[in-house]
Amino acid sequence: MKAVILAGGLGTRISEETHLKPKPMIEIGGKPILWHIMKLYSAHGVHDFVICCGYKGYVIKEYFANYFLHMSDVTFDMGHNQMEVHQRKAEPWRVTLIDTGEETLTGGRLKRVADYVKNEEAFCFTYGDGVADIDITREIAFHRQHGKLATVTAVQPPGRYGALQMEGDKVAGFTEKPRGDGGLISVTRQGSALR
């Protein structure tokens, strides 16, 4: 099974970080968000990834082109123009990086990578800018059991601000960042292959 990861958005709400790199490459604990997402999927047996690149996609390409360099100890012999890699650490991943355009919306990005998943019985589809505690194995099993075109995993986000409870013109109470307005946001999707 493959996982398609959207990694092409601009990241306007955290522009202080994303003027240098795409949002999925912002680091958490010294590793890009994208790496954490891929580790989660890999822990559930998904090792084949199609990354939808866009804004500053070359940063993602350079990261994977130099993956051994990032993940291993190395010795550079400058006089002999040689590099020796020590303790090679690599994930069992196959990573396909596709330029899906800078302004392309979600559906357009998925359409541009359709050829890379067309022979799959099903595939996972997720955003490259958020890490969630999701049982991917269970979600895939659920998708297969129900035989639907798509399965969506969603969460209710917390509120962004504390809230006052008012009684007339007096404050009656305060709630620290209550649950959101009841709306859900999509975290990940499993879908049947595009035809």
Where does each model-flagged region fall?
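A general structural signal for well-ordered alpha-helical segments in protein cores
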Residues: G57, L110, V171, S186-V187
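Conserved nucleotide-sugar donor-binding
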Residues: S186-R195
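Short, flexible helix/strand-to-coil boundary loops that buttress conserved ligand/catalytic motifs
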Residues: T18, F64, T175-P178
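N-terminal glycine-rich phosphate-binding loop and ensuing alpha1 helix
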Residues: M1-E62
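Short, flexible, basic/aromatic active-site loop/helix in glycosyltransferases
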Residues: E167-G183
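Conserved beta-loop-beta/alpha segment of the NTase-like Rossmann-fold superfamily
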Residues: E62-G168
